[in-house]
Each structure stands twice: as structure tokens, then as C-alpha cells.
């Protein structure tokens, strides 16, 4: 048995405990990829953006454990509305196509960012399963934030592509 919230004990395979384990793994993946990007001497801006998402992940875990609402007004410096606009129209903001499919030709940084994006999406699915309650979700705040996080990583990927394109034309 393990503690879910307050004095509520559940089995280790409880969906919320599984979700927390996946969230913990996601945090570790962000730290590992930040370390790799730092060793590759990648732009600090990308590492800082990933740190901002990591801060949200840690706050998300805290809010779930303490059964508190999760609220964060910005991610990577963008409001929820700006995040949506940037992720749905990267051509307007970054001069790159939307969701360029990953390829080894785009390099290790793009592959690492895509790995993080897909890991966030996997966590979103685990979260939906953990908090599904009949026809609704108990923690829609967390589900929505994970969706925003995958958009944020997509935006970081777009920023990276814009950087590559600028280097090629310089």
C-alpha cells in the first residue's frame, strides 16, 4: 500500500500512483535531455525553456500529491492563448512549417526535443486514464496542462528549426 492523498492508502498499481510514476520518469527525462543539450553546447534558451516546463511538472506532482488545484498562467513565457496561437501557426511566428516530422537529418537536438514531446503526450494519456471518472475527469487542470506542455515542446522544436534555417541562410 502507498499513500495517495492525506491518509488515503491505495495499492501500488492504482492508476494515480502509476501516473505519478510516469510523471517522475518524465521529470527525469527532461533533466537528462537538458544535460545532453548542455554537453552539446546547445543554446541556453532551449535548456531554459525545458527548465520552465520541468518546473511545471514538479508543481503538477506537488498539486496531485497534496490534492490542490494546478494553475500556471504561462509556459516558456507564453500565455495559454499565445501558446495555442504559436503552436497552431508556427509559420507566422517562427517561419517554419507546422509539425515537421522528425528525421535523423534534423540532428540530435531535434530528436531529443521530439522524444520529450512524445513523452509528455504519453503522460497526458496516463493522466486521462488515472483521472477518468465516468463521463468526466477529476483533474482536468492537469490534463489540460500536459496538453499545453506538449504544445510548448512543439514550439521549442519550431524555434530550433528556425535556428537551423537561419544558420543555413547565413
Q: Where are each of the predicted segments found?
A:
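Phosphate/pyrophosphate-binding loop motifs in nucleotide- or prenyl diphosphate-using proteins
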Residues: 1-170
Amino acid at each position: 500500500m502507498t499513500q495517495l492523498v492525506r491518509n488515503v492508502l491505495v495499492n501500488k498499481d492504482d492508476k494515480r500512483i502509476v501516473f505519478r510514476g510516469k510523471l517522475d520518469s518524465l521529470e527525469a527525462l527532461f533533466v537528462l535531455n537538458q544535460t545532453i543539450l548542455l554537453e552539446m553546447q546547445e543554446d541556453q534558451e532551449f535548456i531554459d525553456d525545458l527548465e520552465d516546463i520541468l518546473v511545471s511538472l514538479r508543481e503538477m506532482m506537488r498539486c496531485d500529491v497534496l490534492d490542490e488545484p494546478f494553475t500556471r498562467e504561462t509556459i516558456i513565457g507564453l500565455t495559454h492563448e499565445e501558446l495555442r496561437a504559436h503552436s497552431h501557426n508556427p509559420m507566422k511566428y517562427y517561419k517554419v512549417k507546422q509539425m515537421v516530422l522528425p528525421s535523423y537529418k534534423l540532428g540530435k537536438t531535434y530528436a531529443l526535443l521530439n522524444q520529450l514531446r512524445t513523452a509528455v503526450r504519453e503522460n497526458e494519456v496516463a493522466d486521462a486514464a488515472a483521472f477518468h471518472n465516468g463521463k468526466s475527469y477529476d483533474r482536468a487542470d492537469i490534463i489540460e496542462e500536459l496538453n499545453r506542455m506538449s504544445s510548448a515542446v512543439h514550439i521549442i522544436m519550431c524555434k530550433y528549426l528556425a535556428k537551423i534555417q537561419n544558420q543555413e541562410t547565413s
